[in-house]
Amino acid sequence: MVKRISILGSTGSIGTQTLDIVTHHPDAFQVVGLAAGGNVALLAQQVAEFRPEIVAIRQAEKLEDLKAAVAELTDYQPMYVVGEEGVVEVARYGDAESVVTGIVGCAGLLPTMAAIAAGKDIALANKETLIAGAPVVLPLVEKMGVKLLPADSEHSAIFQCLQGVPEGGLRRIILTASGGAFRDLPVERLPFVTVQDALKHPNWSMGQKITIDSATLMNKGLEVIEAHYLFGLDYDHIDIVIHPQSIIHSLIEVQDTSVLAQLGWPDMRLPLLYALSWPERIYTDWEPLDLVKAGSLSFREPDHDKYPCMQLAYGAGRAGGAMPAVLNAANEQAVALFLQEKISFLDIPRLIEKTCDLYVGQNTASPDLETILAADQWARRTVLENSACVATRP
């Protein structure tokens, strides 16, 4: 039976890899909705190839360019919607059974909530939705009775390992991290690294923001918070280990101390496919893992001096309330400034820490959506206000 899906962030890394899955499995999936930011050329190609029923382009001023780019499709005309509201329309579009949330950052929160409220199952590739919005997202998931399935490699690995583990059987989660672009760089050299240096990920092909998050290890810190919300373990039972080969995507320890792991080549398509096909397993012709070719697998403790963002994430997670939303927004804004070469690499954790410290007195244990969104905006403003004052010298 063909599953009808919509993709939020179709021109990004997650979106294009999801569409690659659809291309190889047309008997399993049909695209009914696409939402993208402003990449007209790529979105036009996707519209022509997959012929969705509804298409959103967030940058409304580019709608006419998009229509012109697909003008030769005289036998087909989708419904066009624009702006943030248009993305929400795609998220809740009636004919889709599942929605892949590939929008980067907290911008994915409201569309994901709209999809959940419309009764759609979620293939969650946007971790910020849970990190910032868990206090409102999780009750909505329970109310609507939808499935919230992890589509990133680490949480998919945990989810796969948990199949068959009885309730209460999970003892510890071990998240693996590649270590990012600077895993082998002496910490003394970090003040001198450039944007180009930070974007050279050793293992994965990802978007710019998540690649920087990998270099700071904030990506793993955010995944700790996401794992807490998805799987219900407290932070003392969620660990991070550096695994340079990125073959083991994460592990779980069960009550008898047995450890289960999910292995595979670094390929985001596998967790995406599993989130869309669960509980089934769909045959693929992708290159299977060859353990001899993979060679030795190594592990080491993260360097806390090199990766201060990791502990900032643990601290925000333990604080709870709207603090994870503040952490996430501060990180998004700081990373954006770094990518614009307005701050140094080491200014990223400095700005995040200062912002979180300033929010402590405002935090509330059970924030509503309005409070979460206000905290997000406050954190972004605070980072911008303090960015001119950070110590950028080596």
From Swiss-Prot:
Keywords: Isoprene biosynthesis, Manganese, Metal-binding, NADP, Oxidoreductase. It catalyses: 2-C-methyl-D-erythritol 4-phosphate + NADP(+) = 1-deoxy-D-xylulose 5-phosphate + NADPH + H(+). Its cofactor is Mg(2+); Mn(2+). Pathway: Isoprenoid biosynthesis; isopentenyl diphosphate biosynthesis via DXP pathway; isopentenyl diphosphate from 1-deoxy-D-xylulose 5-phosphate: step 1/6. One of its GO terms (molecular function) is NADPH binding. GO terms for biological process: isopentenyl diphosphate biosynthetic process, methylerythritol 4-phosphate pathway involved in terpenoid biosynthetic process. Its EC number is 1.1.1.267. Pfam families: DXP_redisom_C, DXP_reductoisom, DXPR_C. NADPH binds at residues 11-14, 37, 39, 126, 128, 207. 1-deoxy-D-xylulose 5-phosphate binds at residues 127, 153-154, 178, 201, 214, 219-220, 223. Mn(2+) binds at residues 152, 154, 223. InterPro entries: DXP_reductoisomerase (IPR003821), DXP_reductoisomerase_C (IPR013644), DXP_reductoisomerase_N (IPR013512), DXPR_C (IPR026877), DXPR_C_sf (IPR036169), NAD(P)-bd_dom_sf (IPR036291). NCBIfam families: Dxr, PRK12464.1. Catalyzes the NADPH-dependent rearrangement and reduction of 1-deoxy-D-xylulose-5-phosphate (DXP) to 2-C-methyl-D-erythritol 4-phosphate (MEP). Belongs to the DXR family. This is 1-deoxy-D-xylulose 5-phosphate reductoisomerase. It comes from Synechocystis sp. (strain ATCC 27184 / PCC 6803 / Kazusa).
